[in-house]
A protein has these predicted regions:
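Catalytic cores of DNA base-excision repair glycosylases
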Residues: 1-168
């Protein structure tokens, strides 16, 4: 279950008021950070965010990594999140593979087996890389990435998919 944006906004504003820069967050102690996250749950995310800030300051000279490969080295950031950040922030042509996208790809490409299985996961990533590689060079990666997530969350839903509304129908 995802936390709603409307719920997060007041926490976000308060968090940024206290930690306006990566350096400010990196220099804080974990005990200083946690109260600003209290009420949101997912406390491992707060700890990872704090550790990310420290790594960015100490290993990347305070500059946010720009490639999905570098982003994936940060605490708590896996390949899909790294690719999403790189696509949204820097336009990198790097596919994502979150739960929604996995569902779209398994249904559209007829891939059987549980997406958490290594072989299935590898096949999905390979397909995603191929799709991006075969896309026009001027593909807006942020729009493509958001569109995939939206398609999986609003049309190609886990239960009661709205196949008649799917833009991928032939």
């Amino acid at each position: 279950q995802q936390t709603q944006v409307s719920t997060v906004l007041s926490y976000y504003e308060r968090f940024l008021e206290r930690f306006p820069t990566v350096l400010a967050l990196a220099e804080a102690t974990q005990d200083e950070v946690m109260p600003y996250w209290a009420g949101l749950g997912y406390y491992a995310r707060a700890r990872n965010l704090h550790r990310c800030a420290q790594v960015i300051v100490n290993e990347f000279q305070g500059q946010f990594p720009r490639s999905s490969e570098q982003l994936a080295t940060l605490p708590g950031i896996g390949p899909s999140t790294a690719s999403a950040i790189a696509a949204f922030c820097f336009g990198e042509r790097s596919p994502i593979m979150d739960g929604n996208v996995k569902r779209v790809f398994t249904r559209y490409f007829g891939i059987y087996g549980h997406p958490q299985k290594r072989a299935v996961d590898q096949a999905l990533w390979a397909l995603a890389r191929d799709v991006v590689a075969q896309s026009p060079v001027d593909l807006n990666m942020a729009a493509y990435t958001q569109g995939q997530m939206d398609l999986g969350s609003m049309v190609c839903t886990r239960s009661k998919p709205r196949c008649e509304d799917c833009p991928l129908q032939t």
